[in-house]
Design a protein with these regions (language model features):
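Function-determining surface determinants
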Residues: 1-303, 308, 315
Length: 316
């Protein structure tokens, strides 16, 4: 069953609100889930704005602020989890990893306090007002349908992903590869919108995006941890191990890079493909109407109101 972007946005706002209590308690799972919710909302809001005819700029900024505050704590949680994983895999470096884990936990405490204060300062109820059409922002008024807006954003995100993949090259550039991850995330959440609204259901695209995103996420976490160890001049053996792990996962990414190019190309073609599909369907519908109209005419009784009168067999 399909649903509209505004309805999806309202549901996702409810999801975000459901995690607020856990965020205030500093719970790892709530912070992660709330962060994902803000990511989804950032892609939904613009499309929903075109549906209800309201600018979602202020609401978007609100969600972005919430997402950034959540992201700061979420990254620390990911690094703590990675330290615990490596402690099991690298017993010889368990002491060094345990020390780093302790530092990360200490760093998390003030970050969690900042997160709670940030959320207290944000008027999150304004999100519900925005989706209900009560937002104080300007009217969109551009005449676009939400499907047109969605198609344009999918095309844009596809182009951004293609550019990021090309710029990352086949050599390991941590920051460039992180940009690939960011663009892939944005595109993936937009594809979710397309699937849930039944505007577009590309085979395997979202599944493939999730797989590559997982690899890129693993690389990013290890790179962040590596930089912390390097800055403190820690165990050279552990640093070498993390570097080797990154190299292995980067090789996995390169094996899937062609799939990213195909994803991006499909997304860039999407608006044109949809327009062509609508034209074909309209042409077929018009072709079906012609014989139906002909059959209707055959069954009609001739109108004799204007026929000439016949008197005595002659035409008068």
């Amino acid at each position: 069953m399909s649903t509209s972007p505004a309805s999806l946005t309202a549901t996702q706002i409810d999801v975000l609100f459901a995690h607020l209590s856990g965020v205030r308690d500093g719970r790892i799972d709530s912070i992660h889930d709330a962060r994902v919710s803000t990511r989804r909302l950032r892609e939904l809001l613009h499309v929903a704005g075109d549906e209800i005819g309201v600018s979602m700029g202020p609401a978007y900024k609100l969600v972005r602020s919430a997402g950034r505050a959540l992201g700061a704590v979420r990254e620390l949680d990911s690094l703590v989890s990675l330290c615990e994983t490596l402690m099991n895999l690298q017993p010889a470096a368990a002491g060094t990893l345990a020390t780093m884990r302790g530092r990360l936990i200490e760093e998390r405490r003030p970050a969690a306090r900042r997160l709670v204060k940030t959320f207290e300062s944000l008027d999150l109820e304004a999100l519900r007002d925005a989706v209900a059409g009560r937002h104080a922002g300007t009217r969109a008024g551009n005449g676009r349908t939400w499907r047109t807006a969605l198609g344009e954003r999918i095309e844009k995100r596809g182009g951004q992903l293609a550019a990021a993949v090309d710029r990352a090259s086949g050599v390991y550039f941590p920051k460039r590869l992180h940009q690939v991850r960011i663009q892939l995330k944005k595109l993936r959440y937009l594809i979710e919108v397309a699937e849930q609204t039944r505007a577009w259901r590309p085979a395997n695209l979202r599944h493939d995006a999730e797989r590559v995103q997982s690899v890129l996420g693993d690389i990013h976490d290890r790179q962040m941890l590596l930089e912390r160890f390097q800055s403190a001049d820690h165990d050279p053996g552990l640093i070498a191990t993390i570097r080797a792990d990154i190299a292995h996962r980067h090789a996995q990414y390169l094996l899937r890079r062609d799939r990213l190019h195909l994803m991006a190309a499909a997304c860039q073609r999407y608006p044109a493909d949809q327009a062509r599909r609508r034209w074909v369907l309209a042409s077929r519908a018009a072709a079906l109407l012609v014989p139906v109209a002909g059959l209707a005419l055959i069954g009609q009784t001739p109108d004799r109101s204007h026929a000439p009168l016949r008197l005595g067999g002659e035409v008068s």
